[in-house]
Structures are given as C-alpha cells and as structure tokens.
C-alpha cells in the first residue's frame, strides 16, 4: 500500500464538472492499493496518516496530527503510484491490482479509515478526477506499508 499525503489549506475533487469532495485546512491523500495488501495494511496506513504530525504547533514545530487540529482529509484513489519506472520511458503497473479488486480494496481502506476518523471525503475510484489544492508549505510525505 502506498500513499502520498500533502498538507493543504484547501482542496477539492471534481468529476464531470461536479464537486465530489471539498475541504479547508487538512490533508489530501493520494492512495494506492496493491495486489498483496490486506486489512492489516489498511489499518496501519490509516493509523499512520491520522496520527502523523505534519501540522505546526504554537512554536512552529510540526507536532500536531489531523486529529489534534480536528481537520478534514480527502482520500483520492491513485493507481499510478504503483508504477514501476525503473526501466524505459513508459510506466509498468504490474504490482497494481486489477481495477475491480482495487476498487473493493480501496473501499475497504476507506471504511477502516472512517471507523478511525470521521472527517473523511473521497474521490471516485476509476473516475477522471480533477484535483485542486493549495499546498501549505509545501509539506508532502510518501508512505509505503
């Protein structure tokens, strides 16, 4: 399981000219499930994202988590994170899941995330999404579990 999280001042996801997710200060998380991912991976990733301290405290130190500041998050399914880019000039997606399995796994991850934290919005799996965000920093982290 892979994720790239970005601290944002605001973010939104648009599909077919319709806004499907919209947050103010929080996190935009690009999320990729892989073939071997299990519920344990989903639990660990959700905990990592929720508890990771990327927001500044009063002293200006990154010491506060999503929970600490009661912020929102958008989970965006992003299969291209699984691309193997080591050879050639075209990405390979051999470690990614077939779409129907990946959709189920992403939904399972979303459900686990929602059980742990309630201020969650999502993009739409398989849709052509337009993702708009204003980075705060920028502050970006990459996770592999």
Swiss-Prot record:
Keywords: Cytoplasm, Hydrolase, RNA-binding, tRNA-binding. GO terms for cellular component: cytoplasm. GO terms for biological process: D-amino acid catabolic process. Its EC number is 3.1.1.96. It is found in: Cytoplasm. It catalyses: glycyl-tRNA(Ala) + H2O = tRNA(Ala) + glycine + H(+); a D-aminoacyl-tRNA + H2O = a tRNA + a D-alpha-amino acid + H(+). It is an enzyme of class 3 (hydrolase). GO terms for molecular function: D-tyrosyl-tRNA(Tyr) deacylase activity; Gly-tRNA(Ala) deacylase activity; Ser(Gly)-tRNA(Ala) hydrolase activity; tRNA binding. A motif (Gly-cisPro motif, important for rejection of L-amino acids) lies at residues 137-138. A Gly-cisPro motif from one monomer fits into the active site of the other monomer to allow specific chiral rejection of L-amino acids. Homodimer. Belongs to the DTD family. PANTHER family: D-AMINOACYL-TRNA DEACYLASE 1, D-TYROSYL-TRNA TYR DEACYLASE. An aminoacyl-tRNA editing enzyme that deacylates mischarged D-aminoacyl-tRNAs. Also deacylates mischarged glycyl-tRNA(Ala), protecting cells against glycine mischarging by AlaRS. Acts via tRNA-based rather than protein-based catalysis; rejects L-amino acids rather than detecting D-amino acids in the active site. By recycling D-aminoacyl-tRNA to D-amino acids and free tRNA molecules, this enzyme counteracts the toxicity associated with the formation of D-aminoacyl-tRNA entities in vivo and helps enforce protein L-homochirality. This is D-aminoacyl-tRNA deacylase. It comes from Francisella tularensis subsp. holarctica (strain FTNF002-00 / FTA).
